[in-house]
Curated annotation (Swiss-Prot):
It catalyses: an alkanesulfonate + FMNH2 + O2 = an aldehyde + FMN + sulfite + H2O + 2 H(+). Its EC number is 1.14.14.5. The lineage of its organism: Bacteria, Pseudomonadati, Pseudomonadota, Gammaproteobacteria, Pseudomonadales. Catalyzes the desulfonation of aliphatic sulfonates. Keywords: Flavoprotein, FMN, Monooxygenase, Oxidoreductase. This is Alkanesulfonate monooxygenase. Gene3D superfamilies: Luciferase-like domain. It comes from the Bacteria. GO terms for molecular function: alkanesulfonate monooxygenase activity. One of its GO terms (biological process) is alkanesulfonate catabolic process.
Length: 382
């Protein structure tokens, strides 16, 4: 099975280490453009753009990077309850047209009650999922060209319609991640691809089975994806040393404050991430080559696959064997790590790459010339 491999745009900050300004770098438009263009050239299928008050706006970032990329798809956030589903459908269709069919959408219900209240959304966990179901039903139908009247508990529209359709038909795909029962019910009814954060394979297999069963009961099939960090190096020892360096500036107080902040979240997925490490920096390898160190101070995806190319590829294939076809990766710093993943991991996987222009041989430098006169020795990439 060919795998879809996505990268990540760190619009909430980037650097060499977690939890410190040491080795940090400014994430301005020029830097985001560097990462997007690297991902585009290296053969990543798309990039996930995060959302929330700690991030730049994902829609504006995507729109700004469309003109400077050729093949890359942009996975941007839909925020039920924050915006009208009809307006969101018009925005989605516009972004899809502007990008010539390179727009993908990620339904994000939110998990931080404090942040949501600041955005004007005062619904509890169950109510947010009720509103998300209503939002998504309307959004899908409007994008598919229907005239929509809908009277829901949280959302009511009359005569909602779209005059200018998207490029992708019947509409761009919808991605979504959530671990609660309500989230799985929404996924089974509404989305094309269900995402999970990087839990151990047995836990992921259980979630996939649950969503697959719920979708089948509605006569639907759902694809599956996973969100993970990657620390890949030429040897396993080098990879584990890099993992240790990533958290080498973290002190116990920073970890405790981060975990206290994340504890207020009502996201089941966030609670499951926190349970993997318990706020303790010891015994962070929670499954073979699955390291929970990132989650000590980062909300959301908190685990990384660690190892050399063949080792990480073997773990990726374990998840693929469960039915996962889409992997959304990231690494610190994101520019350099995009190259490491492409160079050290891609050769060991069947990666579904966007079409690239064919050069017909060496028409530009590919490895530094030897003695200014001799082409570098060719090495198989398989």
């Amino acid at each position: 099975m060919s795998l879809n491999i996505f990268w990540f745009l760190p619009t909430h900050g980037d650097g060499k280490y977690l939890g410190t300004s040491e080795g940090a770098r400014a994430v301005d438009h020029g830097y985001l453009q560097q990462i997007a263009q690297a991902a585009d050239r290296l053969g990543f299928g798309g990039v996930l753009i995060p959302t929330g008050r700690s991030c730049e706006d994902s829609w504006l970032v995507a729109a700004s990077l469309i003109p400077v990329t050729q093949h890359l798809k942009f996975l941007v956030a839909l925020r039920p309850g924050i915006i009208s589903p009809t307006v969101a459908a018009r925005q989605a269709a516009t972004l899809d047209r502007l990008s010539n069919g390179r727009a993908l959408f990620n339904l994000v219900t939110g998990g931080d009650p404090d942040e949501l209240a600041g955005d004007g959304l005062h619904l509890n966990h169950q109510e947010r999922y009720e509103a998300s179901v209503e939002f998504t039903r309307i959004w899908r139908k409007v994008l598919e060209g229907e005239n929509v009247d809908y009277q829901g508990k949280h959302i009511q529209v009359k005569g909602a319609k779209l005059l200018y359709p998207p490029i992708q038909q019947p509409r761009p795909p919808l991605y979504f991640g959530g671990s609660s029962e309500a989230a799985q019910d929404l996924a089974a009814e509404q989305v094309e691809l269900y995402l999970t954060w990087g839990e151990p394979p047995a836990a992921v297999a259980e979630k996939i089975a649950q969503v697959r069963e719920k979708a089948a009961a509605q006569g639907r099939e759902v694809r599956f994806g996973i969100r993970l960090h990657v620390i890949v190096r030429e040897t396993n020892d080098e990879a584990w040393a890099a993992a240790d360096r990533l958290i080498s500036h973290l002190d116990d107080d920073t970890i405790a404050r981060a975990q206290a902040s994340l504890a207020r979240f009502d996201s089941v997925g966030q609670q499951r991430m926190a349970a993997l490490h318990g706020g303790n920096r010891d015994n962070l390898e929670v499954s073979p080559n699955l390291w929970a160190g990132v989650g000590l101070v980062r909300g959301g995806a908190g685990t990384a696959l660690v190892g050399d190319g063949p080792t990480v590829a073997a773990r990726v294939k374990e998840y693929a064997d469960l039915g996962i076809d889409t992997f959304i990766f990231s690494g610190y710093p994101h520019l350099e790590e995009s190259y490491r993943v492409a160079e050290l991991l891609f050769p060991h996987l069947d990666v579904q790459r966007p079409e690239q222009p064919q050069t017909g041989g060496y028409v530009s430098p590919f490895g530094e010339m030897v003695a200014n006169d001799i082409l570098p020795k060719s090495v198989s990439q398989s």
